[in-house]
Amino acid sequence: MLRFLPDLAFSFLLILALGQAVQFQEYVFLQFLGLDKAPSPQKFQPVPYILKKIFQDREAAATTGVSRDLCYVKELGVRGNVLRFLPDQGFFLYPKKISQASSCLQKLLYFNLSAIKEREQLTLAQLGLDLGPNSYYNLGPELELALFLVQEPHVWGQTTPKPGKMFVLRSVPWPQGAVHFNLLDVAKDWNDNPRKNFGLFLEILVKEDRDSGVNFQPEDTCARLRCSLHASLLVVTLNPDQCHPSRKRRAAIPVPKLSCKNLCHRHQLFINFRDLGWHKWIIAPKGFMANYCHGECPFSLTISLNSSNYAFMQALMHAVDPEIPQAVCIPTKLSPISMLYQDNNDNVILRHYEDMVVDECGCG
């Protein structure tokens, strides 16, 4: 009678319902989160603004009771229930000579996509290049950004990796702030064929503007760019197992508001992540009100209700034959939560989880 709950989610809530929150086996919860083991982040990663905003918007909607499709990222216009912010694991390359006519900055960009599970479908991959804060009062030269796919693994001591065909070329004023590029097709190819992921080759040139009358020093511009440049990859995926169409739950008998404590009703249960030692990798929330259902479902609760209801029929059969189990106290309404956390690759992840909070209970 509990088949409408995902197995792992139900196992998690059942253990909590039995009052064993501190002792329960950690792997059940970690597996439900899509993790093989408890993350041990090497360093604290700041939460990107876009992830923080999406999380806060969802929290506000849940507080006010506004219904939202949490498997659709409105802010980005794509379907998905897992948002990952992957830091660049590449490094700078140093050309032998810097001039206005040559490359100002070269960098190998590398993003580890191994955290994406097999069932997840990529719906967005957005490369972000932060070129430093915007400045309208201290404009610099125009920059030309070129991106190449790296064809072979970089060999230590090699001056530059072997770039393939250029697939992005864009001119931007500097300082510009953040510049974004759509890498969905590239990321899909990397995800399907991990051995092809040798990274990206980024080249930035300083364009000479003879008409501006301003004499820029390329060396100064390049040095400032090396200090300010930060690259990241925002990846959104959709897990079809967790983002299915809304299901009609099997009807359960609502429990009347009676004073008897033994009857089926919702019990409050707050899960504090600090108490469990998970605050080191779960950024937000600090905990959540999971709740659970517990209590008896005697025949007297069902006799006056619709006789076609399955719970009423089971209660009736139990009255005839005690060998048949009674109707049980189950969740009739559950709500999701969103979580911000870090994984073992120092990725910041925003993930939506269905059926984590028990809102109402009934006999079913």
UniProtKB/Swiss-Prot annotation:
Residues that make up the propeptide removed upon maturation: 25-250
Subunit structure: Homodimer or heterodimer (Potential). But, in contrast to other members of this family, cannot be disulfide-linked.
GO MF term set: cytokine activity; growth factor activity; protein kinase binding
Outcome when changing R266C: In KFS3 and MCOPCB6; reduces the amount of active ligand secreted; reduced amout of mature protein in the cytosol
Listed result of changing L305P: In MCOP7; also detected in a patient with bilateral iris coloboma; reduces the amount of active ligand secreted
Gene Ontology CC entries for this record: cytoplasm; extracellular space
Chief subcellular location: secreted
Subcellular location: Secreted; Cytoplasm
Disorder this protein is connected to according to its UniProt record: Klippel-Feil syndrome 3, autosomal dominant: A skeletal disorder characterized by congenital fusion of cervical vertebrae. It is due to a failure in the normal segmentation of vertebrae during the early weeks of fetal development. The clinical triad consists of short neck, low posterior hairline, and limited neck movement.
InterPro entries for this protein: Cystine-knot_cytokine, TGF-b_C, TGF-beta-rel, TGFb_CS
Pfam families (alphabetical): TGF_beta
Protein's name in the database: Growth/differentiation factor 3
Keywords of this entry: Cleavage on pair of basic residues, Cytokine, Cytoplasm, Developmental protein, Disease variant, Disulfide bond, Glycoprotein, Growth factor, Microphthalmia, Secreted, Signal
PROSITE patterns documented for this protein: TGF_BETA_1, TGF_BETA_2
One GO-annotated biological process of the protein: eye development
Glycan-carrying positions: N112, N306
Signal peptide (UniProt feature, chain positions): 1-24
Gene behind the chain: GDF3
Cysteine disulfide partners in this protein: C264-C329, C293-C361, C297-C363
